[in-house]
């Protein structure tokens, strides 16, 4: 029996997986370049300025110049710092958001020259659990970065981050339980397929609100950027970082913004399922994600920063009760709908 066709199939399948992983890593690493340009442009126009204009047409090459500047800066390590943890922290902050995208589907399949290619790396039946388990590791990078620097500002920033992420990951996790109950699955593909006719935002507006606000806090974006508040902490947990290590933290922040936007689209807005206007599913998905990324940027230049006590109160006194009430109401309604 000739086994070569089977071996060739395995080689092609393995090569395709390697290509997908390499493409995903390249996109996520380069993502901050256009996003920083977009953020500065949006800020400029909201403040009746032009934004970056010097480097390239309308400042398009400004992110490249900023990247070169970061790469050529001195990689400074404070004399009293814990050198091992100081070097490890940026990697721990950057790696988890990248790993999470292994479980993120961007569509069903596309046909390339007669070959069906899936737009996901893995269809996990517990994908949601995997996402929350891995993203929780990111907090260790922030804590180690603040502690290892041996700086008061950095330590305070890392402690704030730890408290903030614990306070908001709980309601964030509770917010998706209603979605899981509707789809009867923790697979992100199954959740999108369950929204073919009606998006979950119709059934889960409270869950969406809780997840969106908690996502803002998880991404440490204004109005929840207490961990790196410039006014009272310098730059927070990465005050002592410079050069490529500082760039790691910046890339991590933008990747988390993208991740939260992708999860919002998949969980509540039908993923790649469109309405009214016929468009390719992948284009629908990208447009929805782009809308939420823009919303994150818009919030930064619209809302003031909350005080620390207000931040904690919103998480424990508002979002947590809302998310628990949403679970109870969803369960009651599903039970009533299933009753004869």
Swiss-Prot record:
Subunit record text: NDH-1 is composed of 14 different subunits. Subunits NuoA, H, J, K, L, M, N constitute the membrane sector of the complex.
Record function comment: NDH-1 shuttles electrons from NADH, via FMN and iron-sulfur (Fe-S) centers, to quinones in the respiratory chain. The immediate electron acceptor for the enzyme in this species is believed to be ubiquinone. Couples the redox reaction to proton translocation (for every two electrons transferred, four hydrogen ions are translocated across the cytoplasmic membrane), and thus conserves the redox energy in a proton gradient. This subunit may bind ubiquinone.
Domain of life: Bacteria
NCBIfam families the record matches: PRK06076.1-2 (NF004741)
Coarse class of the protein's main subcellular location: membrane
Top-level EC class as recorded in UniProt: translocase
Reactions it catalyzes: a quinone + NADH + 5 H(+)(in) = a quinol + NAD(+) + 4 H(+)(out)
Record carries keyword Membrane: yes
GO process annotations (BP): aerobic respiration
Family membership noted in the UniProt record: Belongs to the complex I subunit 1 family.
Keyword terms of this UniProt record: Cell inner membrane, Cell membrane, Membrane, NAD, Quinone, Translocase, Transmembrane, Transmembrane helix, Ubiquinone
Record membrane topology: Multi-pass membrane protein
PROSITE patterns recorded: COMPLEX1_ND1_1
Cited HAMAP family: NDH1_NuoH (MF_01350)
Pfam families the record matches: NADHdh
GO molecular function: NADH dehydrogenase activity; oxidoreductase activity, acting on NAD(P)H, quinone or similar compound as acceptor; quinone binding
Transmembrane segments: 10-30, 84-104, 126-146, 172-192, 198-218, 255-275, 279-299, 318-338
Designated name of the protein: NADH-quinone oxidoreductase subunit H 2
GO CC terms: plasma membrane
EC number assigned by the record: 7.1.1.-
InterPro entries according to UniProt: NADH_UbQ_OxRdtase_su1/FPO, NADH_UbQ_OxRdtase_su1_CS
């Amino acid at each position: 029996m000739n086994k070569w066709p089977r071996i060739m199939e395995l080689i092609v399948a393995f090569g395709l997986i390697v290509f997908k992983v390499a493409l995903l890593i390249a996109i996520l690493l380069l993502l901050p370049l256009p996003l920083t340009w977009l953020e500065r442009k949006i800020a400029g126009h909201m403040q009746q300025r032009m934004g970056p204009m010097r480097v390239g047409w309308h400042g398009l090459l400004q992110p490249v110049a900023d990247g070169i500047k970061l790469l050529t800066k001195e990689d400074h390590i404070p004399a009293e710092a814990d050198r091992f943890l100081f070097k490890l922290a940026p990697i721990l902050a950057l790696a988890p958001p990248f790993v999470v995208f292994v479980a993120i589907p961007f569509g069903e399949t596309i046909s390339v020259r007669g070959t069906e290619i899936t737009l996901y790396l893995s269809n996990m039946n517990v994908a949601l659990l995997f996402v929350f388990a891995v993203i929780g590791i990111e907090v260790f990078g922030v804590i180690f970065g603040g502690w290892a620097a041996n700086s008061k500002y950095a330590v305070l920033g890392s402690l704030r981050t730890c408290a903030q992420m614990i306070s908001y990951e709980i309601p964030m996790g509770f917010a998706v339980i209603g979605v899981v109950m509707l789809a009867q699955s923790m697979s992100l593909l199954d959740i999108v397929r369950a929204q073919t006719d009606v998006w979950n935002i119709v059934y889960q507006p409270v869950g969406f609100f809780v997840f969106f606000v908690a996502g803002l806090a998880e991404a440490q974006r204004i109005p929840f950027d207490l961990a790196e508040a410039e006014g009272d902490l310098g730059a927070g947990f990465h005050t002592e970082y410079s050069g490529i290590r500082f760039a790691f933290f910046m890339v991590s922040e933008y990747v988390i913004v993208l991740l939260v936007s992708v999860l919002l689209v998949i969980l509540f807005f039908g993923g790649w399922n469109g309405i009214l206007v016929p468009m390719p599913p992948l284009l629908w998905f990208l447009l929805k994600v782009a809308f939420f990324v823009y919303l994150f940027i818009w919030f930064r230049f619209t809302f003031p920063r909350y005080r620390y006590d207000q931040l904690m109160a919103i998480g424990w006194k508002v979002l947590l009760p809302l998310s628990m009430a949403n679970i109870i109401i969803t369960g009651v309604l599903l039970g009533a709908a299933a009753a004869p």
